[in-house]
Amino acid sequence: MNFQENYDVVVIGGGHAGVEASLAAARMGSKTLLMTINLNMVAFMPCNPSIGGSAKGIVVREIDALGGEMGRNIDKTYIQMKMLNTGKGPAVRALRAQADKDEYADSMKNTVSDQENLTLRQGMVEELILDEEKKKVIGIKTSTGTKYGAKAVIITTGTALRGEIIIGELKYSSGPNNSLSSIGLADNLREIGFEIGRFKTGTPPRVLASSIDYDKTEIQPGDEAPNHFSFMSSDENYLKDQIPCWLTYTTENSHTILRGNLHRAPLFSGIVKGVGPRYCPSIEDKITRFADKPRHQLFLEPEGRNTEEVYIGGLSTSMPEDVQFDLVKSIPGLENAQMMRPGYAIEYDVVMPHQLRPTLETKLVSGLFTAGQTNGTSGYEEAAGQGLVAGINAALKVQGKSEFILKRSEAYIGVMIDDLVTKGTLEPYRLLTSRAEYRLILRHDNADRRLTEIGRQVGLVSDEQWEHYQAKMAQFDREMKRLNSEKLKPLPDTQEKLGKLGFGPIKDALTGAEFLKRPEVHYNEVIDFIGQAPEKIDRTVIELIETEITYEGYIKKAMDQVDKMHRLEAKRIPKNMDWDKLDSIATEARQKFKKINPETLGQASRISGVNPADISILMVYLEGK
């Protein structure tokens, strides 16, 4: 077949999954093509103008630790930074940034355009070109008839795949923010034989900043103390003139307006067919499901420094536009607000993720990968994490190297992908800290310690990032060694000093590390007794030291659990396993095994509906092989 051009990797879709996938493949040396419907929407934020949040912020740190771009890009373009859950334990702390929406997209587009081995091109991909046996992808075809050869293809089409926007009774074919909908590719995936689902998400109205009465709202400032998503970012560059968000609430009048128009709500009238997100429901869904609540929180989030648009977080809706006008004016601070864009719902096709391997390669077609909302997830961060993994694995496949799979104990990205390919999802999947059984290990502060060496091994972490990481870890090791050797002795002046600080006396000599294990003690207080280190210890190293020492016992227990799970993961299941030969397992287990085809005993044990007895039978069978 004649191709216009040939590439190692072709990525379809330039959203948050697509840019990470294409950058990863190109940086690993693969000749890569990124095809996007609209060059002006590369890394565009069609919904909330923010990056991070609970669990999601840790994903961004993981992307950065592996050599990805999202963390670096938001650190260049944020307008506010805030650490969440600071009053809770380190396992659930996460960073959130308010983004300058346009700057974020422009900056990422420039990064993509400047990347060696990467070509950015506008076009609508209509068809995957397969080999004669229809088992391997060899290229793509666009709406203009142009064909490009590819050794691997990654689909990252987001909500554009047969996308339809819904506002009241109005329903029309569209991708996010009135971009083109991808119909041909959606049809093609069905023709190939993929099981396709239909999901829904939504976005709230935007209002004019100058029309808001901020005196009726509560200011939500950013943090003065520096924090960053990228491990490479410097505290010296931390933004001082941050832009605040504002908190307001729905009112009883808001709820009356909504209840009086529920018969016109697409969600309840039958116009919306797709399954919506459980953890980000529309406001009409919220007042129905939580009818006892007198009000709901709303956050007024500026979309950038050079725009008047303000996003009303928490007010996602697809109600008719006239209802939205009344709804907005029922909210304190927005009585005279001008609505610039109405909220809308968008329905789109998804490739049901049980059809994927842990590499995000499809089981049906060799060399074809999918990532992001195409796989049934929600959120920019979840998409970017999957895009990175798909891009790495596409490059490795082309290069004939071993595949890259993140374990549940290594990263939230690993938890997410394992959930998707093992359990599947019947609704838009969102990462939560509660989904991770090893969350004390998967923290914000140690993402580089967990993943940078892995990123270096696959060829994605640059020399500069690697040197920075090694210097940090060397300092961490030196200071940990010092804390474990320097001692506090039960001398009179020590006891007096402890009393003045509100600490109880010590009976025996303690190392600095032993003293730091006390829950009320922090690193700086330990230094008061054992003295300063001979070098200036970086703030991020101190944070890591405090957590590792304070929670040492809990971390050890978690690592013991990880070791047990790794033993199960080490037991591989043959690719062409005949599940009918396992006579003694339950019928439900056999059906699930046939559908998902788990690759390890560990993955099999996590499938919903499979009980320990089924796993024991499978283990005995495998040991007898």
From Swiss-Prot:
NAD(+) binds at residues 276-290. Keywords: Cytoplasm, FAD, Flavoprotein, NAD, tRNA processing. FAD binds at residues 13-18, 125, 182, 373. It comes from the Bacteria. One of its GO terms (biological process) is tRNA wobble uridine modification. InterPro entries: FAD/NAD-bd_sf (IPR036188), GIDA_C_N (IPR049312), MnmG (IPR004416), MnmG-rel (IPR002218), MnmG-rel_CS (IPR020595), MnmG_C (IPR026904), MnmG_C_subdom (IPR047001), MnmG_C_subdom_sf (IPR044920). One of its GO terms (cellular component) is cytosol. Its cofactor is FAD. It is found in: Cytoplasm. GO terms for molecular function: flavin adenine dinucleotide binding. NAD-binding protein involved in the addition of a carboxymethylaminomethyl (cmnm) group at the wobble position (U34) of certain tRNAs, forming tRNA-cmnm(5)s(2)U34. Homodimer. Heterotetramer of two MnmE and two MnmG subunits. HAMAP family: MnmG_GidA. Belongs to the MnmG family. This is tRNA uridine 5-carboxymethylaminomethyl modification enzyme MnmG. It comes from Lactococcus lactis subsp. lactis (strain IL1403). The gene is mnmG.
